[in-house]
Amino acid sequence: MRRNAAATAADPFRMTARASPTDPTDDAAYRLFERRFGAVRRARQLEPVLTFAVVALLFVLAAVWTDFLPATVWHGLPRIGEYFGKLLSIQPRRDADPVPVLAWAHLFGGVKQPQSLAYWFYRIDVYLRLLWQTIQMAILSTAIGFSLAVALCFPATRTLMATPPVVFVVRRLLEVMRSIPQVVLAFILVWPYGIGPLAGILAIALHTTGSLGKLFVELNENADMRAVDGIRSVGGSWLAQIRYGVVPQVWPGFLSYGLLRFEINVRSSTIIGFVGAGGIGQELKRVISFNIYEEVSAIVILILLIVVTIDLLSAQLRHRFLGTPS
């Protein structure tokens, strides 16, 4: 007994050979813990199953309401390449067939020769001028939207702006700008500014401001605040905290998002032309409405070429100036 007492005194955590009697209160608490832990574990296991079931149900309902049915999609797959197959077919075009045809025998004929490239692109000067206008619209709208997003993103950042009402108002403003589709904005702005590129530039610029502003706010909130705290501790103004504490960290991300948005705006400048907002899209709508399928095909080919070219150039710029893979 004395030896065990001495050992226990030397090591109070040492278990003695004799087991302590079981406490009924401890057993009840343990069983209660097991029940609650099991309930929590079952709830966590059930949560992803319920989430998947709800998402699947919503997907099925949306597919039924929009006629997005597997049978319909599968039936149309073989016809995806039909247009391009007829486009380059050597067979003569039937009057009832709306698909324009490029015939190899007349491919390099004159502007009066049907089924030739010159016949398709006889208005190439007009198309190139409108494409250049479309690119200018994208450049101007991106520059305006980028500048406004940079100016508004800092007051909308909770970690940088100490006045909650200002943060709330600026964030709601950015949400309104990006929530309205560009086509709707262009349609609204065509009324006061008339048909032309001005309405398209303003519509894309407003949407760009809202979209880039949200991304810039997220970059600001993830910035390291130690530099900002240091500038604040020595009496630096709010603008000095932004200029020297935040901008050096987030500026590469700003440029990357700006270049990506420029690629998107080139495509958007084409689409909003359908509501009279200028650019090549307005001409595309005209030739579609008159069923001039040769010109439709020519414009679509030019749009594809210019979009792919700009995407490649933008990727090279990101790789060169920001060090990101192209």
Placement of each model-derived feature along the sequence:
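Alpha-helical membrane-interface segments at transmembrane helix boundaries
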Residues: 128-136, 170-177, 259, 263, ...
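N-terminal, non-cleaved signal-anchor transmembrane helix
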Residues: 1-143, 155, 159, 322-326
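Generic hydrophobic transmembrane alpha-helix motif, especially the helices
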Residues: 166, 171-205
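Membrane-cytosol interface at the C-terminal ends of specific transmembrane alpha-helices
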Residues: 191, 195-246, 252-261, 312-315
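Hydrophobic positions within alpha-helical transmembrane segments of bacterial inner-membrane proteins
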Residues: 138, 142-150, 154, 158, ...
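C-terminal transmembrane helix and the adjacent membrane-cytosol boundary/short C-terminal tail
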Residues: 297-326
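Pore-lining and gate-forming transmembrane alpha-helices of multi-pass membrane transport proteins
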Residues: 133, 137, 273, 282, ...
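Alpha-helical membrane-protein architecture signal
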Residues: 120, 124, 128, 132, ...
